Amino acid sequence: MPTDNTSIAAFIDALPKVELHVHLVGSASVPTVLELARRHPDGPVPVDERELRAFYEFRDFPHFAEVYESVSSLVRTPEDVGTLVSGVARDLAAQNVRYVELTVTPYTHQRAGMPMPAVTEALDLAAREARDRLGIRVAYIFDIPGEFGADGARGTLDHALRHPPEALVGFGIGGIEQCRPPHRDAFRDAFAAARAAGLRSLPHAGEMTGPETIWEALEGLGAERIGHGTSCLDDPRLVAHLRETQLPLEVCPTSNVCTGQVADLAAHPLPRMLEEGLFVTLNSDDPPMFNTTLTGEYRVAAEAFGLGRAELASLARNAVEASSLDGEGRKAVIADIDALG
């Protein structure tokens, strides 16, 4: 007879999922990086699989930054961008992820000298192939690298408005939150233009900084969802506002531990966020680099936070409701979640 642990694990594996907070470069698995490393053998990444797996094992945040930058240096052509998307889609489809909003930082591709129309073509082709071959729908969020200030904002907006992929649904900002205040007006202007063009405002906020960054995302950027948002609990007024509006929060527990935002899973605020009645979704952020997966995040929610089937299914439904899936797509995924009982 299966134990409760094996039963919940099987339930999580079978659970239809939606991923809202995952970065393209940070999602590159070892097989995908190995393909890129062999394509560009002059890069800083080992071309031996065993050495690459050792290089990929998470140690600390500085090492994560080194791995991330090393992988980024291998993304040199539109073909490389398409290879990344295809690899991420394959990994997610294997976890029963039906839909993903994949965060792309086009400004880094611009700085690498890639022709932006060709990058868009690669994104479109990879999304179509993922849907046709794997049954997973891939949408995109274009993300300003906040540390590049006004130049990053203008470059990201330019690509979003002039060369948008077919499945571009959102406009975001990531990077080092502490770098944002001097460029606040440029970011506000870029988000206003993106919203006017029909893109959803989906910024990171409240991960590395306090509630003030979340307030700025809400009031200055018109946020419809918040990436991370874990510091909201430090401001009772903000908690009340988020509870009243049910604005979705993209929570990434393993990432928060790995980046040092919380000491360990026992200290993670997700259980309290749920107790406060906040609208929480589970996400993986940079999964291979943090030794996790979206399925793994649901297991963390069960094992570390004590959530049962009904609560896990509720988190899965939240992700569907917070997504940019069309009405029929939402109904289909929710029906499959409900069918698990």
Segments and roles (model prediction):
Residues M1-L199, M208-T213, G220, E224-R225, ...:
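Metal-cofactor-binding active-site regions of metalloenzymes
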Residues A205:
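Catalytic glutamate of the conserved HExxH
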